[in-house]
Amino acid sequence: MRIAVVSDTHLSAPSDWLERAYAQHLATADAVIHCGDMTGRSAWSYFLQHPCFHCVQGNMDDYQLAVDLPPRLDLELEGLKVAVCHGWGYKAGLSRRIYEAFGPDYDIIFFGHTHAREDSQFGKTRCINPGSLREGSLAIVTLDAGKISTEFVTL
């Protein structure tokens, strides 16, 4: 399974660069996961064209969008237990705080907020931040027979 993971789009409406990124990297993914801070409903609606799109609310999403998005998601993908959240507070140590808040039962926790790429491991749990799509970063995460591989893409 090939998952395109994005975060921190910070767009009120789709843009040319978003449409290019979608066509080149997201459209062909088996799933698209957005870790929050989409910001506007029109941008969110653009992502809905993907048949397997998941999104959580971020701290910068406008109210009209945020009320329709969950603060976190729990998914099962390819037999792996996956959580998705945006993140909170200071950037330093965020992945550890998220891991401690969610607990050790997850195989993967996808998060955003810091605009910085990260692929950390705590026990059996991988904490993956794709960086900011607005700043030209996303992650392609491949799940294959219980193995997790991450490729960071610069747009």
Question: Residue ranges of each PLM-predicted region?
Answer:
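Charged helix-capping and loop-helix junction motifs
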Residues: 18-20, 68-72, 93, 98-102
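Short secondary-structure boundary/capping segments
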Residues: 23, 45, 73-74, 100-101, ...
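Active-site neighborhood of phospho(di)ester-bond hydrolases with catalytic His/Asp-centered motifs
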Residues: 5-7, 31-37, 54-59, 84-86, ...
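Binuclear metal-dependent phosphoesterase catalytic core
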Residues: 6, 77-78, 101-106, 121-122, ...
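Mid-chain, well-packed structural core segment of small domains
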Residues: 78-111
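N-terminal active-site segment of His-dependent metallophosphoesterases
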Residues: 1-53, 61-70
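Active-site environment of divalent metal-dependent phosphoester hydrolases
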Residues: 11-14, 39-43, 60-66, 89-94, ...
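Helix-adjacent hinge/juxtasegments
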Residues: 52-90
